[in-house]
Amino acid sequence: MAEGDTILRAKERLSDALVGQSIGVSAPNPRGRAAGIERLDGRTLAGIDAHGKHLLFDFGDLVLHSHLGMSGGWHVYGRGERWRRPRTSAWAVLSGERSEAVEFGGPTLRVLPASRVAIDPQLARLGPDILAPEFALDAVVGGLRAAPGRTLGDALLDQTL
């Protein structure tokens, strides 16, 4: 399973390869989870945000939300470079000028309006990202103190803190 530090590195690789470019989009796997992804084709990728194990690709008024789960992964290749996995196993391909990013597997790959990100049930329940530059330790400590009977193990597993 991809952990937060792995997602942060993926965000950096993906950002270096694609941010600021007009992106071609395809979903080669006919059973892929990329419903609505064609709406992103030709749009400029403004940025990518990592929040815990989630990646959010900012296309202006639309966001591509990716969660890799236990077995998913984003691969970055040079345009025309041979992929390590078959094309038909790709859920999504984001093609820039010189690079392309390919998502294989993962339980979540969806497009949502940017206006819904803050209220989306899957994303709104997430607590602060400890790897984010703006991480506020005081807020987490306050959350822990608000439930003094909770065990440390339960607190660490609670993503809303």
Please give the residue ranges for each predicted region:
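Extended, highly charged segments
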Residues: 1-63, 95, 148
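Phosphate/anion-contacting hairpin/loop surfaces
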Residues: 64-161
